[in-house]
Swiss-Prot record:
The keyword Disulfide bond does not apply. The active site is at residue 201. Residues 69-538 form the Protein kinase domain. GO terms for biological process: regulation of mRNA processing. GO terms for molecular function: ATP binding; protein serine kinase activity; protein serine/threonine kinase activity. SUPFAM superfamilies: Protein kinase-like (PK-like). This is Putative serine/threonine-protein kinase L205. Its EC number is 2.7.11.1. ATP binds at residues 75-83, 98. Belongs to the protein kinase superfamily. Ser/Thr protein kinase family. Residues 20-49, 278-314 are annotated as: Disordered. Keywords: ATP-binding, Kinase, Nucleotide-binding, Serine/threonine-protein kinase, Transferase. The lineage of its organism: Viruses, Varidnaviria, Bamfordvirae, Nucleocytoviricota, Megaviricetes. It holds the Pfam family Pkinase.
Length: 542
């Protein structure tokens, strides 16, 4: 056990130690797990039981995992995991390590299983455009606190990072957008068609650029001049037979961590001075998992009248399900009493002109050579599922969430395609297509549905009637119009692209046609990845 872990455990209060012993992370028996990563037995433990636990005191720069992975700098973080720039001591390589939060240990096991399958396919198909798993293991702090660690190539950063600031804040050049989208669709074509995997979290944060940005080069430069390699070689010569004696090996590891901590001192100073280049990746908090039965895996026919829910029927189970999903002010009684909002006057899609030319921010956040000739990889399979094991819970980031998911209808692979279209629009304009924020105290789902119907078109009546959430989302007395929203005029993507983002008519027409193929509200008529790859808008991409 390393010095930092021993120190931390020695400083823990007795009550905290007892809490550690009690803590256990639940698993779902329907999940498929990698046999090499053990999972915990299920047991409910409240958040208060681990409130004294501080992960940063254990997982920190200079920490050595598996005897060979030296953590240099945290380069990404979300609700459920962190990503570290890592030095592989044995192979003398700089890599990326994803460390799953111990509370989501079994989600990490599921992700490893999925990425293992992806990586097996990728060995013989180099143009797959998905991250490849190089190694995985688990780190055990105590019997009940375990981390799943997975190793990947080091990338330059995500597209989200590129769009936040700098010269591409208001969108990327269209040839680059087309290249990225073609690579993304190529990866999804394989995931859906050959590997039976739904990603369910396609967004700019999860699309990585290949390359080595300046801040990573600076970290490597500082590490190289620290003399770690020479000190490590000297340490190994002092302990030639360390693997034959556990006590000697522990002593070796303690000394290794001393020289590792010394090696990253300048990197920590650089990090404190700059305090940049760590991406904060938002995650959706829903973690309760129920799974579709295999009988649900067919494409759903929303026009089948026999399965409509009657608004006058007893819907006890549905009400219970929706009470769990709604916010505190969104019980049906309160929604029915809210005033109808006129959202149309809040949105003038013709007045916000593109700011690309007038922007004074011309910085290259990532070297242009990695952008113009981009090679990308789809990442973060922590929310992914094999198709026949997909969750019943709400999936996808809010901004890229498909209408069938909002309506709580059966979803298929094409929910990922909806997300692709949203991402394509954002890459080309710098703006999120659907970004509901609960206008006029509306539920965000109602605001989201308004934006979808305003821009894309009306949701088919059959889908509205089929929705388990129809009482919360639609007003039957107004012909299943969106609840609490006044009548509004629709617009269209072609008009928005020309008037707001100054696309030429030809560019807008072609791009809007491509987007609408992926934004078909009825998933049965939405294009799949293979069909979109054949769309004329992508014809000029190599």
């Amino acid at each position: 056990m390393s010095i930092s872990v021993c120190y931390y455990l020695s400083k823990m209060s007795e009550s905290t130690k007892v809490q550690f012993e009690k803590k256990s992370v639940g698993h779902n028996s329907d999940d498929e797990y990698d046999d090499t990563v053990p999972y915990n037995e299920d047991d409910e433990t409240s958040e208060e039981e681990v409130q004294e636990y501080n992960e940063d005191e254990v997982i920190h720069p200079g920490f050595v995992l598996k005897g060979t992975y030296l953590l240099l700098k945290k380069i990404g973080s979300g609700n459920n995991a962190s990503v570290w720039m890592t030095y592989h001591i044995s192979n003398d390589k700089f890599l990326a390590m994803k460390i799953q939060d111990h509370l989501c240990y079994n989600d990490g096991c599921r992700e490893v299983t999925i990425v293992n399958k992806i990586s097996e396919y990728g060995k013989n198909n180099p143009d797959f455009f998905c991250v490849q798993l190089l190694d995985h293991f688990y780190f055990e702090l105590s019997d009940n606190i375990k981390y799943v660690c997975s190793i990947y190539e080091l990338y330059a950063g995500s597209i989200h990072f590129l769009l936040e600031e700098g010269k591409y804040k208001y969108g990327l050049p269209l040839p680059v957008v087309k290249t990225i989208i073609k690579q993304l669709l190529t990866s999804l074509s394989t995931l859906h068609g050959k590997l039976n995997i739904i990603h369910s979290d396609v967004k700019p944060e999860n699309i990585l650029f290949k390359g080595l940005p300046d801040y990573q080069k600076n970290i490597i430069k500082l590490f190289n001049r620290s003399g770690f390699r020479e000190k490590y070689a000297e340490l190994c010569s002092e302990y030639p037979n360390r693997h034959e004696n556990l006590e000697i090996e522990d002593e070796f590891m303690d000394n290794l961590e001393y020289i590792a901590m010394d090696a990253i001192k300048e990197i920590r100073i650089l990090e404190e001075c700059l305090n940049t280049n760590e991406e904060l990746i938002p995650d959706d908090p829903d973690n309760n998992e129920k799974y579709y039965d295999s009988t649900d895996s067919e494409e759903y026919d929303y026009s089948d009248n026999s399965d409509y829910y009657d608004d006058d029927e007893d819907t006890g189970p549905i009400k219970k399900y929706n009470e769990r999903l709604q916010s505190v002010d969104d019980c049906q009684e309160i929604l029915d009493c809210k005033e109808i909002c006129d959202l149309d006057k809040e949105y003038n899609f013709a007045t916000v002109l593109n700011n690309r030319e007038s922007s004074s921010d011309k910085r290259e956040i990532i070297d242009d050579k990695y952008v113009i000739n981009c090679q990308t990889a789809l990442t973060d399979f922590g929310n992914s599922y094999f198709f026949d094991k997909r969750t019943r819970n709400e999936i996808q980031d809010r901004r890229y969430r498909a209408p069938e998911v909002i309506l709580d209808l059966n979803y298929t692979f094409c929910c990922d395609i909806w997300s692709v279209a949203c991402v394509a629009y954002e890459l080309a304009t710098g703006y999120v297509l659907f970004d509901p924020f609960g206008e006029h105290f509306l539920n965000r789902d109602l605001h989201h549905l308004f934006l979808i119907e305003k821009i894309v078109g009306e949701i088919p009546l059959a889908m509205k009637k089929k929705s388990k959430r129809r009482k919360f989302l639609f007003d039957k007395s107004r012909g299943y119009h969106i609840k609490n929203v006044d009548e509004f005029k629709s617009t269209n993507l072609e008009t928005i692209l020309m008037n707001q983002y100054l696309f030429s008519k030809e560019e807008a027409e072609s791009f809007a046609n491509f987007l609408m193929c992926g934004l078909s509200i009825d998933p049965a008529t939405r294009s799949n990845a293979d069909e979109l790859l054949k769309h004329p808008w992508l014809n000029d991409v190599n």
